[in-house]
Regions:
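A short LG(V/I)-centered, amphipathic sequence patch enriched
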Residues: 5-24
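Alpha-helical linker/hinge and terminal dimerization helices associated
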Residues: 7-8, 29-51
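Flexible hinge/capping segments at coil-to-helix
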Residues: 52, 119-130, 134-156, 240
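A late-sequence structural motif
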Residues: 70, 216-259
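Beta-alpha-beta core module
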Residues: 118-124, 128-129, 188-235
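Secondary-structure junction motif
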Residues: 140, 154-174, 238-246, 256-257
Length: 259
């Protein structure tokens, strides 16, 4: 009480041999103090409820191949275990956009390519091998691995700059440059263009898995990978619902990421 009186600069209690009584100032501020105490109690109850009840809203950032191949199955199976947790899902055009959303707090967690540029706290989930995709009637459709010389000579459909780091690094390691004829943002667009015979491409396996259009998938001349992870801004500051989701994703991908 003495500390509170010093902080407020007013006398709240009158002290005498008979005990203590509220001063006029004390009576004036008492209702406000009671409201503050009630609000604090309500807040603590809510927090404890969130700890005990698996509820809340998790905001997730993702990119197209994870959205298509993993996320629907993850959310479906997670929802059976934690039916009270809700989700908001946003899809980023580029990995750095997703990282920016995590840093700013726009989302609670996000799927991204590792290593993180913005030094987020991350968990590695899956090594995604790059694959050559060609039209089904391509002369080299049955060549596995695909010839290096053909990768340099054939018309190439390139993923838009910003998501193509591993692909360009693979060409650098092979010592060749692709014969780029088209640049596209969406992996599904590239799959359709390859299927129509407009060229070949080099994409991560998760992008070409279960292609909606007919294509032929071949191994690259060498093994190249991108590492997919899930990232958060601060592991220690996660809500209970976000922590449950991140832990669930790590287990799910270990068991199901290749299917």
């Amino acid at each position: 009480i003495n500390s509170l009186e010093n902080e407020l600069g007013v006398k709240l209690l009158s002290r005498n041999r008979g005990g203590v009584v509220l001063t006029a100032d004390g009576r004036a501020v008492l209702p406000k103090i009671e409201k503050l105490c009630a609000a604090h109690h309500s807040l603590m109850q809510t927090v404890e409820g969130l700890k005990d009840m698996d509820s809340g809203v998790v905001k997730i950032a993702t990119f197209s191949s994870v959205s298509a191949q993993w996320l629907p199955r993850i959310l479906k199976s997670f929802g059976k275990v934690y039916p009270n947790i809700e989700f908001e899902v946003v899809t980023g055009d580029f990995y750095d956009q997703i990282e920016g959303w995590i840093v700013s707090g726009t989302v609670d967690c996000g799927f991204l390519r590792l290593p993180s540029v913005k030094r987020l706290q991350t968990y590695a989930l899956h090594r995604d091998e790059l694959q050559v995709i060609v039209p089904c009637d391509h002369p080299y459709a049955d060549r596995d691995p695909f010839p290096v010389s053909a990768l340099a000579e054939e018309p190439f459909i390139q993923l838009e700059e910003g998501d193509d780091y591993e692909i360009m690094a693979a060409f650098d390691e092979m010592g060749i440059r692709p014969n780029v004829k088209y640049i596209a943002r969406e992996d599904r667009t590239i799959l359709a263009m390859v299927s129509e015979g407009l060229g070949i491409s080099l994409l991560p396996e998760l992008m070409v898995r279960h292609s909606p259009t007919p294509i032929k998938v071949c191994h690259a001349p060498l093994h190249f990978y991108r590492t997919i992870g899930i990232g958060v801004k601060d592991k220690k500051a996660l809500s209970n619902s976000t922590r449950l989701f991140v832990d669930y994703v790590r287990t799910w991908v270990t068991e199901n990421g290749n299917t």
